[in-house]
């Protein structure tokens, strides 16, 4: 097992060929956010829509926010953004887990955006066939969602009070968000996430955004690759969880990411990580609802109170 992980790691760090002209995201985003004028009843969900425009194309994103019973407006409040899996919705975590009771237990506001089929990419290409919206999903989280929460609900206003987590593709998204925005999130967690695209060159989801690996290996290695960006997690607490019977995203995706963090740590960095493999668990809500207890406890320990 260890030899296989090291081999995968070596492949991920070395491969960098292929004539794919790398393309960075370009475009202008326009959205208006102002203080919420509706009624917030602590102990309930608020359902909202974010309206934004990117390169002239307008879009709406649904989200729901849980405000615990002791919530006080304008108080700096601990906030956890919860990302769902591929083609999920803002209803996934509330419907399939005990997030409300955990939010009450740890006094945290919970934000569940509807992110559709995004892979939390930062750019689209001519070969991209999977566009969840006009703006790449990875950019939306940092450039629209978080500023909206800050301006409208006074949530996620401080890094050390804000966490981000996700399951499956959302786990990849949470880790990427923390890597890209080290001053925005005080802790991050990924459950059943995929973090090393180069080790899965036949992954059709990844190809739907970045083009086929055989044609664009440099994109797969250099763009939106959590392994490549891992160094930016220095000082950010990270929780990784995976079921050992996961046949959709193999547990080696989390294990190899830990190997990468350990390697960076040996080079002098400080990486605060928790890695948990859940015996006899697969890629489903039985695991994700169970592991949520560990993740929320982790956020309670790592985020400021």
Segments and roles (model prediction):
Residues 8-16:
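Bacterial N-terminal signal peptides
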Residues 18-305:
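Non-catalytic cap/lid and distal C-terminal segments of serine-dependent acyl enzymes
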Residues 2-8:
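Sec-dependent signal peptide recognition
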Residues 1-2, 201:
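Structural motif marking the loop-to-transmembrane transition
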């Amino acid at each position: 097992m260890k030899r296989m992980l090291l081999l995968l790691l070596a492949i991920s760090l070395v491969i960098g060929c292929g004539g794919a002209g790398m393309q960075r995201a370009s475009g202008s985003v326009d959205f208006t956010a102002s203080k919420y004028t509706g009624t917030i009843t602590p102990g309930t969900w608020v359902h909202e829509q974010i309206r934004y425009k990117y390169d002239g194309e307008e879009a709406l994103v649904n989200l729901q926010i849980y405000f615990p019973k002791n919530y006080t407006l304008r108080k700096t409040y601990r906030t956890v953004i919860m990302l769902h899996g591929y083609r999920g919705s803002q209803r996934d975590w509330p419907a399939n887990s005990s997030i409300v009771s955990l939010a009450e237990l740890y006094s945290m506001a919970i934000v569940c955006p509807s992110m559709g089929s995004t892979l939390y990419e930062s750019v689209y290409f001519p070969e991209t066939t999977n566009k969840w919206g006009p703006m790449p999903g990875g950019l939306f989280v940092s450039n629209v969602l978080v500023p909206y929460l800050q301006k409208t609900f006074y949530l996620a206003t401080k890094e050390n009070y804000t966490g981000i987590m996700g399951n499956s593709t959302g786990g990849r998204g949470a880790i990427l968000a923390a890597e890209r925005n080290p001053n925005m999130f005080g802790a991050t967690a990924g459950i059943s996430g995929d973090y090393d695209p180069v080790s899965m060159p036949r992954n059709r989801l990844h190809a739907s955004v970045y083009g086929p690996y055989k044609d664009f290996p440099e994109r797969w290695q250099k763009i939106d690759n959590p392994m490549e960006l891992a160094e930016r997690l220095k000082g950010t607490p990270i929780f990784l969880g995976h079921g050992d019977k996961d046949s959709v995203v193999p547990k080696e995706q989390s294990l190899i990411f830990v190997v990468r963090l350990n390697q960076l740590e040996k080079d002098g960095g400080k990486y605060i990580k928790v890695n948990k493999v859940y015996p006899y668990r697969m890629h489903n809500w039985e695991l994700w609802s169970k592991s949520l207890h560990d993740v929320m406890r982790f956020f309670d320990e790592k985020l400021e109170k």
